């Protein structure tokens, strides 16, 4: 165990257009090589596409519903007990839930078949808000894994 003190969480500023901290976090996950302006254009472009495709809901509501649909409630963590390694199901902390949801959405969007990242991201957010798509499947697989290993839940720490 580390003897140093725990690292402080960095505070991020809300994004300029919507004033939302989670959009800024999402932007930072999309960003490559410190090019924040490029990431900003990708995200705001995707939000424009979402606004055109979903008239009933705003892009920010669609984004938040997509995040909620992808966020896992439970995951498995490896625990070594007497020479055997067990996959122990544990609840996911709220900050990790959001981080995993964002990471899975961005990864799923990057693997999609559309031409530009803006289109890929808009498509994945739209799918996730409708409870389908690769990112939602990832969450379902995580939950299935946890359910399959429920017998080892008494090894929780």
Curated annotation (Swiss-Prot):
CDD domains, A to Z: uS7_Bacteria
**Molecular function terms in GO for this entry?**
rRNA binding; structural constituent of ribosome; tRNA binding
Coiled-coil region list = none
Disulfide bridge map: none
A GO CC annotation given for this chain: small ribosomal subunit
In its UniProt record, which GO terms are filed under biological process? translation
Listed PROSITE patterns: RIBOSOMAL_S7
Keyword vocabulary terms for this entry: Ribonucleoprotein, Ribosomal protein, RNA-binding, rRNA-binding, tRNA-binding
Q: Which Pfam family, any one of them, does this sequence belong to?
A: Ribosomal_S7
Q: So what does this one do?
A: One of the primary rRNA binding proteins, it binds directly to 16S rRNA where it nucleates assembly of the head domain of the 30S subunit. Is located at the subunit interface close to the decoding center, probably blocks exit of the E-site tRNA.
Q: Summarize subunit and interaction data from the UniProt record for this chain.
A: Part of the 30S ribosomal subunit. Contacts proteins S9 and S11.
PANTHER family xref list: RIBOSOMAL PROTEIN S7 (PTHR11205)
**Family per similarity comment:** Belongs to the universal ribosomal protein uS7 family.
The name under which this protein is listed is Small ribosomal subunit protein uS7
Q: Which organism is it from?
A: Caulobacter sp. (strain K31)
């Amino acid at each position: 165990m580390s003897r140093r003190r725990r690292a402080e969480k960095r505070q991020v500023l809300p994004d300029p257009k919507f004033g939302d901290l989670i959009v800024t976090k999402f932007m930072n996950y999309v960003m490559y090589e410190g090019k924040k302006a490029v990431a900003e254009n990708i995200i705001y472009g995707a939000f424009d596409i979402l606004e055109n495709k979903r008239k009933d809901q705003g892009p920010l509501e669609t984004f938040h519903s997509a995040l909620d649909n992808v966020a896992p409630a439970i995951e498995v963590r490896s625990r070594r007990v007497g020479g055997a390694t067990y996959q122990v199901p544990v609840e996911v902390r709220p900050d990790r839930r959001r981080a995993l949801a964002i990471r899975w959405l961005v990864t799923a969007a990057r693997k999609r078949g559309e031409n530009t990242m803006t289109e890929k991201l808009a498509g994945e957010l739209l799918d996730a808000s409708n409870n389908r798509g690769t990112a939602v499947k990832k969450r379902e697989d995580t939950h299935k894994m946890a359910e399959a290993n429920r017998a080892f839940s008494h090894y929780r720490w």
